[in-house]
């Protein structure tokens, strides 16, 4: 067990709460002590919802452990059913309650309730939040549809042609506390409608029990978020023969591939590759002279699997960036992330220790970081611009306005979010030229991605560190002053080159002259 101040994912019962809160008419009875009710704040403070999640806690205390906690579970189940009258009931336990082995799901299933009861067994000490969300959705769909499973799974995704209607698809995976899920659903619905494709059911976000029963009526399932929906899509494919799309439409290229995959599966003519150029501003800008100075920028990417893989493709294929680091905290997505990293000549970082991620980030020395809320903090300490691309996130990454990541408009949002921190670097450099003015000190810099005074003080402090080994070099005062004249977004690269040159020629101090010599050496 590790003691930490940050975790990328909560325990699996938080994932179950996300599914219950995303749906209509579903209630979750959670066997948990009083201290485990903190998760409510995630929905009211981060997601900024107007209502609490539909969760009833048993809230047992230490004195209850000497009595019959099983009866406590039954009482809370009855009270929840009488009060909320749900269409389906989820019953599970938190990480703490798992230790006392009350098996609340089995207790609830033996109470003879009239609505479907889904027992959730979520191993809190080996699995985490995204797995818990995926398992909850899978168990709920499986429990509600088990009576509808045909003897032989026969499903023709092109049957809409014989039935004289438009093709229908299900969007699976969007949930509360997902990254821009609400906006992604609206954007993908708009995108599909433009191509003559109707959306039958969106689940779990906004879906009810009756909607789940209608899932097999669609022609195709679309797996928008593999972390949450892939296991459900695989079950529907095995038992109902329903195919599903595997391309996540984040970025111009991925959106086009997504449309081609969906159209091909439904028997429609694939759209033109030029559609992205007409609908999104990203392709034009990345080919324009204005973006030339952004070409080759070093980018470090870390987040959930789907968004990290999509970001790597956008950076390498659409914006001309150089990906110098790629990783995820989601072990369930380790295989596709490793494959994406291998295609870029990298070794993927599969890790849920934020300190190890920060160390890898510092070693890669990127000029832009794309990550989670924690990478924003780490990048700020290192003086590197950052954009958040994935959960976990803070309230500023849950905008009230529409801000999707998927589809053509999502590509525009990504274009703004990722390029602006680098564009702001030019302004910071100009401000740095007027450093003597009291209004333009390091601590007053204008965007969150820059470390400000802490970054500058960290750099100057390096010159005060005593000699550690033979390869250690020291920066003189005039060398540091000259280094500060270089724009911050390439300063790290210049520092590394100068130190490498000094070691190569046997110089123990780096002055302004050494810096000029290093510049000439690497340009030769």
From Swiss-Prot:
Kindly list the biological process annotations in GO that this record carries.
Answer: light-independent chlorophyll biosynthetic process; photosynthesis, dark reaction
Q: Which residues bind substrate?
A: 425-426
Q: Which cofactor does it need?
A: [4Fe-4S] cluster
Q: Alphabetically list the UniProt keywords.
A: 4Fe-4S, ATP-binding, Chlorophyll biosynthesis, Iron, Iron-sulfur, Metal-binding, Nucleotide-binding, Oxidoreductase, Photosynthesis
GO terms (molecular function) for this protein are: 4 iron, 4 sulfur cluster binding; ATP binding; metal ion binding; oxidoreductase activity, acting on iron-sulfur proteins as donors; oxidoreductase activity, acting on the CH-CH group of donors, iron-sulfur protein as acceptor
Give the reaction(s) catalysed.
chlorophyllide a + oxidized 2[4Fe-4S]-[ferredoxin] + 2 ADP + 2 phosphate = protochlorophyllide a + reduced 2[4Fe-4S]-[ferredoxin] + 2 ATP + 2 H2O
> Is Iron a UniProt keyword of this protein?
yes
As recorded in UniProt, its EC number(s) are: 1.3.7.7
Q: Where is the active site?
A: 290
The record's section on InterPro entries has:
ChlB/BchB/BchZ (IPR050152), LI-POR_suB-like_C (IPR013580), Nase/OxRdtase_comp1 (IPR000510), P-CP_red_C (IPR042298), Protochl_reductB (IPR005969), Protochlorophyllide_Rdtase (IPR016209)
Q: How is the cofactor bound?
A: Binds 1 [4Fe-4S] cluster per heterodimer. The cluster is bound at the heterodimer interface by residues from both subunits.
To which pathway does this protein belong?
Porphyrin-containing compound metabolism; chlorophyll biosynthesis (light-independent)
- The residues that hold [4Fe-4S] cluster are 36
Q: Which NCBIfam families match?
A: DPOR_BchB, PRK02910.1-4
Family to which the UniProt record says this protein belongs: Belongs to the ChlB/BchB/BchZ family.
Q: Summarize the protein's role.
A: Component of the dark-operative protochlorophyllide reductase (DPOR) that uses Mg-ATP and reduced ferredoxin to reduce ring D of protochlorophyllide (Pchlide) to form chlorophyllide a (Chlide). This reaction is light-independent. The NB-protein (ChlN-ChlB) is the catalytic component of the complex.
Instruction: Quote the subunit structure annotation.
Output: Protochlorophyllide reductase is composed of three subunits; ChlL, ChlN and ChlB. Forms a heterotetramer of two ChlB and two ChlN subunits.
Give the protein name, as stated in the record: Light-independent protochlorophyllide reductase subunit B
Q: Which organism is it from?
A: Parasynechococcus marenigrum (strain WH8102)
Q: The organism's lineage?
A: Bacteria, Bacillati, Cyanobacteriota, Cyanophyceae, Synechococcales
